[in-house]
């Protein structure tokens, strides 16, 4: 059995009404080192129920790569800056991936914790 250390990261999925707002949020997160990288996908169609009506809107989606534990700070920041009353913010924790990328994200965001990853070889 091989035991390898892997940096912990989180992926934060978030939407914004425009590419301009998404870019402003992404820039602030990367500049403050709350995020190592943010991908922005524009012109995504969203259908949702709001106050009893089905709405359809175009949105930009952000996929934010951050260090473990920083998603709470990201959520706090975004809730203050976002134009939506109830912004979509979802956190995912990858269990596998490129160890070098995980370490890069941890380094950029100043996260030093690692986890043990036990694998059968």
Regions found by a protein language model. Name each.
Residues 1-121:
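Positively charged, small/polar-rich N-terminal and surface patches that mediate targeting and assembly
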């Amino acid at each position: 059995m091989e035991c390898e250390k892997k940096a912990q990261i989180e992926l934060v999925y978030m939407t914004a009404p425009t590419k301009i707002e998404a870019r402003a949020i992404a820039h602030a997160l990367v500049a403050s080192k709350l995020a190592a990288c943010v991908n922005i996908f524009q012109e995504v169609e969203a259908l949702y129920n709001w106050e009893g009506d089905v709405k359809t809107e175009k949105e930009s989606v952000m996929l934010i790569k951050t260090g473990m534990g920083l998603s709470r700070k990201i959520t706090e920041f975004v809730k203050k800056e976002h134009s939506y009353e109830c912004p979509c913010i979802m956190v995912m924790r990858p269990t596998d991936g490129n160890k070098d990328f995980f370490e890069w994200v941890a380094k950029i965001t100043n996260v030093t914790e690692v986890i043990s990853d036990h694998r059968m070889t």
